[in-house]
């Protein structure tokens, strides 16, 4: 049984979120939550929230035992980028790229 949860349009770059996702892939959920809780990265908070949601989905919808769940797959895809302009000196302007990402966590009992 596989259960997934998604956070779409998360306000972090996919590159930064993937660093966190790579740390928990394939681990038991208890160990993964422990790692995410003590990680100093902003993306760890976002990934932890999605993992908690996936665990709750597995327990509520499938009646799964939390102690047997493992993080099956974690992937982070790029979302749309919001483009903003920052005025600079002498009439110039720079582009600010506000990147978003889609975080998906799959938990399974296998």
From Swiss-Prot:
The keyword Thylakoid does not apply. It comes from the Bacteria. InterPro entries: Ribosomal_uL22, Ribosomal_uL22_bac/chlpt-type, Ribosomal_uL22_bac/org-type, Ribosomal_uL22_CS, Ribosomal_uL22_sf. One of its GO terms (cellular component) is cytosolic large ribosomal subunit. One of its GO terms (molecular function) is rRNA binding. GO terms for biological process: translation. Pfam families: Ribosomal_L22. Belongs to the universal ribosomal protein uL22 family. Part of the 50S ribosomal subunit. This is Large ribosomal subunit protein uL22. It comes from Shewanella baltica (strain OS155 / ATCC BAA-1091). The lineage of its organism: Bacteria, Pseudomonadati, Pseudomonadota, Gammaproteobacteria, Alteromonadales.
């Amino acid at each position: 049984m596989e259960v997934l949860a998604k956070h779409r349009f998360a306000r972090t770059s996919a590159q930064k979120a993937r660093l966190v996702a790579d740390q928990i892939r394939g681990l038991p959920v208890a160990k993964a939550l422990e790692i995410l809780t003590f990680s100093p990265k902003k993306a760890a908070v976002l990934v932890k929230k999605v993992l908690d949601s996936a665990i709750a989905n597995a327990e509520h919808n499938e009646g799964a035992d939390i102690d047997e769940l493992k993080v099956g797959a974690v992937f982070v895809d790029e979302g749309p980028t919001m483009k903003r302009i920052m005025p600079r000196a002498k009439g110039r302007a720079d582009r600010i790229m506000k990147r978003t990402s889609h975080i998906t966590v799959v938990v399974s009992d296998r």
